[in-house]
């Protein structure tokens, strides 16, 4: 006897829970796909019952709920497992929401590049010929085998789910948001490429049998498969060209570029961190820093007062109000006014500021949401007059192009 699919249900629940911990979009799409699979399974059982009733009128029939219950029970188990794992990450946020701290702003879905306004058809995209051919082969295999192969059915439903999500994403654009369907294109490519691998194996077997099983056919097929894999492997740098360029030209946390050229201002981050910890006398996880150079926080995990853009900000942080508060600080007239404003900030005020210098003033590059434009953010600069920090309450240190201001 088999386990009746319970092993798969537990594994799927664990997968969904882990995806909820790392990438919400993929989690929601995965849940949508699993539910769609359940609906297809239920509809198939119902259709089979209907066919039996037509050909065998006296045969016993199960009701709609009796057909649905085993599927629904497995979905419930998956949901419980996924929820338990997801709460490891989501519990603090949900606790805040449930106690009345509702999100003031949430623009995570406000992004509509050109690729998000059309359906993706990787099987007809031959800018990367091998990937396109593999996806096309996968599409053909799904059409041919969807009625007889569980693997094909699972992959086909997943592909259909992505296309349905893409259509829904286009539809909700009218409501001022999106489903970020363009982010699912890599998943679509993986699904079709996996189907293409199955199609190649089964197609080669079918040809082998059709030509009377010649002795050297298997060897020839293996050679073609190996050469195809090598060719595809060699094309990966072309597919990842932008990412590879960034890897070689970006300055790392040690102030070094992989291409050995002069590093960017990031090379000063180590010194900034050293001075900041010395002057605050506190560990990083007890310090709030306001800076527009948020990559600094990637290397040194201080708490940031403001995110780079609203799309990546915690919805509970009220990104627009924080931006307005920062702008208000720049318009104050004296250090005493600034100190008072910081002491009465609606949120925990910055313990330090990391600026760029502009003459006698200090600048921050902030951003605001301008969806549905592409790019979806507008960058703007705010200037703090240097005179606002001319007080013993502030300790000022120039480091490279940066100015670090630490509150006493």
Residue ranges and their predicted role:
Residues 23, 27, 185-192, 224:
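Alpha-helical transmembrane segments of integral membrane proteins
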Residues 2-9, 23, 175-178, 259-263:
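Alpha-helix capping and helix-loop boundary segments enriched in small/acidic/polar residues
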Residues 83, 204-245:
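Signature aromatic-anchored transmembrane alpha helix within multi-pass, membrane-resident enzymes
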Residues 8-9, 17-158:
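Transmembrane catalytic cores of multi-pass membrane glycosyltransferases
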Residues 100-127, 155-217, 243-245:
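Membrane-helix boundary/interfacial segments in multi-pass membrane proteins
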Residues 16-20, 82-90, 159-171, 227-235:
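Aromatic-anchored segments of alpha-helical transmembrane domains
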Residues 1-3, 14, 32-40, 44, ...:
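Transmembrane alpha-helical segments
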Residues 228-330, 341-370, 392-407:
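Short periplasmic/luminal acceptor-recognition loop of GT-C membrane glycosyltransferases, typified by
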